[in-house]
C-alpha cells in the first residue's frame, strides 16, 4: 500500500475515532472498510503499531491503535471456533488462524503448537515458535522468536528478532490510554521465566532479565555499578535481576520495609552476549 493510501486510511480512522460515539455494529461504508483494511495490514505485518527510527527512538502509530479500538465498536459478539476438543469461544475478535489450511501455515513459516492462541491483527513472522501461549491483537512478533509455554504477548506489544520469552512471561498490552506507547522488547533479548514487562516499558537490544523480574513504569531500575536509578527502560546488553532497596524508616526510627526494584548487575558487549550462556551471565 502506498504512502498516499496509508495517509488516506489514517485520516478516515482519525475522523471516525473523533466521532466514535456514532460508530456501532450497524456502521457500514468507508469507516468499516478502513478499520478492516487496517487490521488486515497489521495481521500481515505490512504496518505495525510502533516502528524503530534511525536514532533508536520508537515512533508510535496511534491511528492503528484507534483502528483496533474502533473494531470493538463495529463487531458484534460471535462464535469463535478452534478450541480444544472442538470447543468454542464467544468474542468479537476471531482467531488469526480462522479458515487456515496447510498452505497458509506453510506460507506463514512459523510453528504454532496445540493451544497456542493468536488473535486476528497480530503479526507473527517466519521461524517464530509459539508454544501454548497467547498473542493479543495488534501485536508484532518478529523472526526467530520463541514464545514459550503460558507466555503472553499483550495487545500491540512489539517483540523483536531472536527474542526468548520464557515460560509464563507476561508482556503487557497497551491500547489505552492512547498517549501511552506499547511495551517493546527489542532484538536478541532474553526474558526469564515468570517475568513481567508492562505499561509501555522498553527492554533494549540484547538485554537479559533473570527469572521473576517485574518492570513497570514506576519500578526503580538500579545500576549496581553506579547507583543510578532510572525508570521505564532497560539499557541494551544489560543483565537484570530482581532485588530490593531499603525503605524509609518508620516514624519511631525503626527500619521500614524494603521495596522491590530491578537491579542491573552487569553490562556486556554484543560479542560477550552472543558467546556467553544465560546462566553464566546471571551468576554474580
Swiss-Prot record:
One Gene Ontology term, aspect cellular component: cytoplasm
Keyword Amino-acid biosynthesis among record annotations: yes
Main localization category: cytoplasm
GO terms (BP aspect): diaminopimelate biosynthetic process; lysine biosynthetic process via diaminopimelate
Subunit relationships: Homotrimer.
EC number: 2.3.1.117
Keyword annotations from UniProtKB, A to Z: Acyltransferase, Amino-acid biosynthesis, Cytoplasm, Diaminopimelate biosynthesis, Lysine biosynthesis, Repeat, Transferase
Binding site for substrate: 111, 148
PROSITE patterns named in the record: HEXAPEP_TRANSFERASES (PS00101)
Disulfide bridge map: none
InterPro entries, A to Z: DapD_Trfase_Hexpep_rpt_fam, Hexapep, Hexapep_transf_CS, THP_succinylTrfase_dom1, THP_succinylTrfase_N_sf, Trans_hexapeptide_repeat, Trimer_LpxA-like_sf
Pathway the protein acts in: Amino-acid biosynthesis; L-lysine biosynthesis via DAP pathway; LL-2,6-diaminopimelate from (S)-tetrahydrodipicolinate (succinylase route): step 1/3
UniProt subcellular location: Cytoplasm
Organism: Agrobacterium fabrum (strain C58 / ATCC 33970) (Agrobacterium tumefaciens (strain C58))
Name of this protein: 2,3,4,5-tetrahydropyridine-2,6-dicarboxylate N-succinyltransferase
Catalytic activities: (S)-2,3,4,5-tetrahydrodipicolinate + succinyl-CoA + H2O = (S)-2-succinylamino-6-oxoheptanedioate + CoA
GO molecular function: 2,3,4,5-tetrahydropyridine-2,6-dicarboxylate N-succinyltransferase activity
UniProt xrefs under Pfam families: Hexapep_2, THDPS_N_2
Sequence similarity: Belongs to the transferase hexapeptide repeat family.
First-tier enzyme category under EC: transferase
